[in-house]
Amino acid sequence: MTSPLLISLASCLVAVNQASLIGRCDLAKVLHQEDLDGFEGYSLTDWLCLAFVESDFNITKVNENTDGSFDYGIFQINSHYWCNDYQSRTENNCQVDCQELLSPNLLAIINCAKKIVSGAGGMKNWVKWRLHCAGRPLSYWMTGCHLA
């Protein structure tokens, strides 16, 4: 579902010095627009906390792991299991090129994250979410954000 909000958000990100950071409330709006609030039992605050602890809201973050795989994008999705980086062995369960997970419109990474969360373990698949977000009060992540 491509929306005018996603298109305008992508335009803003590209226009500001090729910025790769997205604001917390802007991300909340996109996630809400893409129906992630309540998806598989996780709230927008879970998704915001995940994005912060994994990437500090950096859409284009890439991190190399000790096993030679890479983590991509705002949710740091791993190339060994979820996307094809053409560098390391991959299962490519999301059937997507890893570079697409760095796109400012966020659709590819949101769709892949939904697939991950829909499977066994849900958000527990992200170690940093388990350590820093799970079971904690997270309502402050939405402070000052207006979704309408």
Curated annotation (Swiss-Prot):
InterPro entries: Glyco_hydro_22 (IPR001916), Glyco_hydro_22_CS (IPR019799), Glyco_hydro_22_lys (IPR000974), Lysozyme-like_dom_sf (IPR023346)
GO CC terms in record: acrosomal vesicle; cell surface; extracellular region; sperm flagellum; sperm midpiece; sperm plasma membrane
Coiled-coil region(s): none
Main location, first listed in the record: secreted
Top-rank lineage group of the source organism: Eukaryota
Catalytic machinery residues: E54, D71
PROSITE patterns the UniProt entry points to: GLYCOSYL_HYDROL_F22_1, GLYCOSYL_HYDROL_F22_2
This protein's UniProt keywords: Antimicrobial, Bacteriolytic enzyme, Cell projection, Cilium, Disulfide bond, Fertilization, Flagellum, Glycosidase, Hydrolase, Secreted, Signal
Subcellular localization: Secreted; Cell surface; Cell projection, Cilium, Flagellum
Record-annotated C-type lysozyme domain positions: 20-148
SMART domains: LYZ1
Family membership noted in the UniProt record: Belongs to the glycosyl hydrolase 22 family.
Molecular functions per Gene Ontology: lysozyme activity
Protein name: Lysozyme-like protein 6
Subunit and interaction comment: Monomer.
The protein's enzyme class: hydrolase
Catalytic activity entry: Hydrolysis of (1->4)-beta-linkages between N-acetylmuramic acid and N-acetyl-D-glucosamine residues in a peptidoglycan and between N-acetyl-D-glucosamine residues in chitodextrins
GO terms for biological process, alphabetical: defense response to bacterium; fertilization; fusion of sperm to egg plasma membrane involved in single fertilization; killing of cells of another organism
Organism (species): Bos taurus (Bovine)
Signal peptide (from-to): 1-19
Known role: May be involved sperm-egg plasma membrane adhesion and fusion during fertilization. Exhibits bacteriolytic activity in vitro against Micrococcus luteus and Staphylococcus aureus. Shows weak bacteriolytic activity against Gram-positive bacteria at physiological pH. Bacteriolytic activity is pH-dependent, with a maximum at around pH 5.6.
